[in-house]
Amino acid sequence: LNNVHFLCTEIDFMGTTERKAKEKEELKALILKAARKLFIEKGIGQTTIRNIADSIDYSVGTVYVYFRDKNEILHALHTQGFVDLGGQLKVLFSVKDPMERLKAMGKVYITYGLDNPEMYDLMFTLKAPMEFLETIQKDEWDEGKASFDLLRTTVIQCMDAGHFKGHKLDPLCFLIWSCIHGMCSLEIGSRTKNANIKNPENIVTDAYDEFLIIISNL
């Protein structure tokens, strides 16, 4: 009987531990959901620990149990963005022709950026996620590295197929990324509307088509 009682107690303890772990994960997800809503609707300035706590009816102290500061929350949100974008890019590896895949990756990247301008800024422009990495003394930007590796792998395969002869791998990858990022950033920042550009409503699409012509001839 003692053995049975001990076994039941152990099972109950394990069940309680698992339940508490699940509750913690659910509350952490709730905090991030509230933070993302605030960030997208009201901007980084209004995405404060206090406002996040108020929006989910929890104390500020509860939020601090899960996140050390605002920058950690913003870093977690930026990671969510990379999971979303990375998932869309990985699907394209079903495209066997690496050049066609490279072209499709650019379109997916641009579409994601223009459809999610606030998240795009957080992922690629705002300093908060990088400041968090500095705070915890982490040198590598894992999310950026993973995305860059998807691009690098595709460009390597393009080179193996005979494209980009005479070009250096990483500088070329960085050039491709920079050009597409620039298109997204200028459009998101409303820099294309009043710059005396013809057909500004289509300029990103038209510019990307021109970019594809250029890289196809490299």
PLM region spans:
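N-terminal intrinsically disordered/low-complexity leader segments
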Residues: L1-E26
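Amphipathic alpha-helical packing segments from all-alpha helical-bundle domains
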Residues: K90, T135-A161, D170-F174, N202-I213
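Generic hydrophobic, amphipathic alpha-helix propensity
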Residues: K24-A35, I52, L77-L89, L151
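Helix-turn-helix
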Residues: L30, L38-E72, A76
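Short secondary-structure transition hinges
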Residues: D115-T153, N194-E201
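Hydrophobic/aromatic-rich alpha-helical bundle segments in the mid-to-C-terminal region
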Residues: D160-A207
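Hydrophobic alpha-helical connector segments
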Residues: K90-E118, L172-I176
